[in-house]
Amino acid sequence: MHVTIEYVIMIPLLILGTFLFPIFANAVMNTWVNSRQTLALQNVAGQLGSAVQQLYFSLNHDSVPSGTVTYSPGLPPFIESSFYMGDATLSSSASPGSSPSFLQLTVTLVGTSNSVTTTVILGSNVLWQPSIFMSNSTDACVTAQKFSNGTILLWFGG
């Protein structure tokens, strides 16, 4: 009699466990993969933002003549077999004059919902040309053009 009661209790639990374990394991793995991809995107966004800022500050000096500089940041073309895209928007602070401009950089992993944003502080003499950074492009780069009046135009190449 006791054996029958044990089977009545254990068989449904085993069947339930057989279905619940894969569902639970899938949910945990999805969370882990999304976290890992987001961390990699944050790293890429930080490096790309740093490249833009360094390019700007390198040209933003009176001793540097007007001209164009292109920099390839050496970022990986893929994050876990997916390429990513970078986009940026320039905004100025409310007060005119020598106030800084802010470049909001958004990097998105294509094929996923993962996206990160970082902000880069630049000077008041900067312009941004709308462009997209494509990680899988062979000529993915950041380009800066300094004009004779000291204005620096930045954009993504590739």
What kind of region is each of these model predictions?
Residues 5-46, 57-59:
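Aliphatic-rich helix starts adjacent to a transmembrane/signal segment
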